[in-house]
Swiss-Prot record:
This is Alpha-conotoxin PeIVA. Contains 3 disulfide bonds. They are not added, since framework IV presents two different connectivities (I-V, II-III, IV-VI and I-III, II-V, IV-VI). One of its GO terms (cellular component) is extracellular region. It comes from Conus pergrandis. The cysteine framework is IV (CC-C-C-C-C). Expressed by the venom duct. Its main location: secreted. Keywords: Acetylcholine receptor inhibiting toxin, Disulfide bond, Hydroxylation, Ion channel impairing toxin, Neurotoxin, Postsynaptic neurotoxin, Secreted, Toxin. Belongs to the conotoxin A superfamily. The modification 4-hydroxyproline is found at P5, P11. Alpha-conotoxins act on postsynaptic membranes, they bind to the nicotinic acetylcholine receptors (nAChR) and thus inhibit them. This toxin has higher affinity for the fetal (alpha-1/beta-1/gamma/delta subunits) subtype (IC(50)=<5 nM) of the receptor than for the adult (alpha-1/beta-1/epsilon/delta) subtype (IC(50)=4000 nM). It blocks the elicited currents completely and dissociates very slowly from the fetal muscle receptor. The lineage of its organism: Eukaryota, Metazoa, Spiralia, Lophotrochozoa, Mollusca. It is found in: Secreted. GO terms for molecular function: acetylcholine receptor inhibitor activity; ion channel regulator activity; toxin activity.
């Protein structure tokens, strides 16, 4: 998911700030 444009994935998953 990280760095890959995916509508199903939220950026907060990569940053750890959800």
């Amino acid at each position: 998911c990280c760095g890959v444009p995916n509508a199903a994935c939220h950026p907060c998953v990569c940053t750890g700030k959800c």
